Amino acid sequence: MTDRESSRDKGRQAEELACAHLRRQGLATLGKNWTCRRGELDLVMLDGDTVVFVEVRSRRHRAWGGALESIDARKRQRLILSAELFLQQEARWAKRPCRFDVVTVDTSDGQSPPRLDWIQNAFDA
């Protein structure tokens, strides 16, 4: 297994942990790893009447910065554009309120299970 495959697998594991956590909080899954020409939406969830676009960030080493800090303006713009395309293609959700959340998965101290933080309304569109 290459480092890239290993990182991808760890990213998918973090997304599964985040999805399970959000489902326990009452959210329903609308989509996972939704891709388009603009990028990818890790999770698309429904929280009551609100469509929630979730970016999952995982960090093993705090020296590289926190997971939330890794979402720069360019990444936010790609997420917003991807969400717009999702709503165009999935018109049944287009008239609902939307928000962008982030779930951070922290494995930096070797905790088992990893620490998850759910940041609602992490940024505005």
Swiss-Prot record:
Superkingdom of origin organism: Bacteria
Molecular function terms from GO: nucleic acid binding
Record-linked InterPro entries: Restrct_endonuc-II-like, tRNA_endonuc-like_dom_sf, UPF0102_YraN-like
- Pfam families for the chain: UPF0102
- UniProt xrefs under PANTHER family: UPF0102 PROTEIN YRAN
The family note in this entry says: Belongs to the UPF0102 family.
Q: What is this protein called?
A: UPF0102 protein PA4424
Q: Which organism is it from?
A: Pseudomonas aeruginosa (strain ATCC 15692 / DSM 22644 / CIP 104116 / JCM 14847 / LMG 12228 / 1C / PRS 101 / PAO1)
